[in-house]
Amino acid sequence: MISLDTLSLFLSINENDLVEELVMTLLASPQLAVFFEKFPVLKNVLTRDLPRHKADILQQLKSTAVPPLLEAEFQRFQQYQALSLRDFNAGLPDLLAWLAHQASPFNEKAQALIANNDTQQCNSAQQTLFLQRWRLSLTLQTLTLNQQLLDKEREKLLAELQQRLAMSGQLAPVLADDDEAAAGRLWDLTRGELQRDDYQLIVQYGDFLASQPELLKLAQRLGRSREAKPVPSDDAPAEIFHQPVREPASVPEEVNGLHQSDDILRLLPPELATLGISELEIEFYRRLVEKRLLTYRLQGESWHDHITQRPVAHQHHDPQQRGPFIVCVDTSGSMGGFNERCAKAFCLALLKVALAEKRRCYIMLFAHQVISYELTAGDGISQAIRFLSQRFRGGTDLAACLEAVLVKLSDVQWHDADAVVLSDFIAQRLPDALITRVRTHQEQQRQRFHAVAMSDHGKPGIMRIFNHIWRFDTGLKSRLLRRWKR
């Protein structure tokens, strides 16, 4: 069986040019032009994705089999092309009969070429002309087949792109904003068969998230919690240190008190009086020599730099790699209602952070069993829809969830992940062995565990094992206070 790609190769048909023309026609279609005008970011994303679509179409051409009649005619053409003139003339009647029997598009032209020859025999030039016209007929048939297949692929691809563009246009304000990188990752998540009603569930929770801005801020703070930290440097050299020092100046500026000196110009009146008494004159001169006369002290102040060298402890910032999110969501009955909506909206907010920062987001629902969804996989939107469709009506088995998290963190791909537990933490006490294992991961592997507490009534003993506790109380009083502060 000959593939369409092989037949095109034998007939020197350039399929790459055909595919390139199809793509250019597709991009110029009015349906896509409307989307590109409304969402310009998606045009760049789609352009980036074009090589993959071209490769898929070329692969489709390679895997498409040639119709049996066309394959048989091509094999007959190859057979007659290799014949000598005598053998060609000998087999010509059988060939004409075969073309007529197969209703070949070349039959009419072949009969006309031979009808012009009275002897029903061909010379060398007529043989060459016959084979050229036959090859041209085969080429036209192959081009027609290629075009039919490409038209079918174009319609299929156009329908797929329209669906994905419509979905991305609806979800971009919820999960990507105007971030082109996030929009590109969102585009990658939209593969799969989804109807409009399916992804409207994400839009609804996106609207709810917009009405609870504190949830989005909490997710962003949690995502930024692994910032670069200052680390002291041990090999810091000594540096020159400048310190301003104030010292008295000899320049007279103001009276600053009394002192003993030999300054005649600033003598106090009692000292001058002793000079006029003959009995005390010798005492005056003795005190003058000893600089013990009471005088006014006039002085100012001056500042200068005191330069010293001392060792300075330098610090450099050690960037902390931001790994994936592993989010454990409590689906017990106490997490139903408003708590359930907040939990799902918070997971969407974390997905938004993950798309913007090129991180993975893995959701684990824990009740009586653990159910997992990876929202950043190739079918992430489909998995997100299945997650949002879940109902929180189970029990609380936090220990089983943490066991599953520890197993996931042991995987090399998830070694740098941040584990986030979303619950009201109204649960049974954790086993001591599990607490020890969590502590070991925190201390030896430097892995971080976050608790998002959705109630003020959670058990403190359970939450002590977490590195960070983020509180979002969903009680009526807290909801009213948050609404009043907006």
Curated annotation (Swiss-Prot):
InterPro entries: Uncharacterised_ViaA, VWF_A, vWFA_dom_sf. Pfam families: VWA_2 (PF13519). It is found in: Cytoplasm. SUPFAM superfamilies: vWA-like. Coiled coil: none annotated. Keywords: Chaperone, Cytoplasm. GO terms for cellular component: cytosol. Its main location: cytoplasm. The keyword Chaperone applies. Gene3D superfamilies: von Willebrand factor, type A domain. Component of the RavA-ViaA chaperone complex, which may act on the membrane to optimize the function of some of the respiratory chains. ViaA stimulates the ATPase activity of RavA. HAMAP family: ViaA. This is Regulatory protein ViaA. It comes from Erwinia tasmaniensis (strain DSM 17950 / CFBP 7177 / CIP 109463 / NCPPB 4357 / Et1/99).
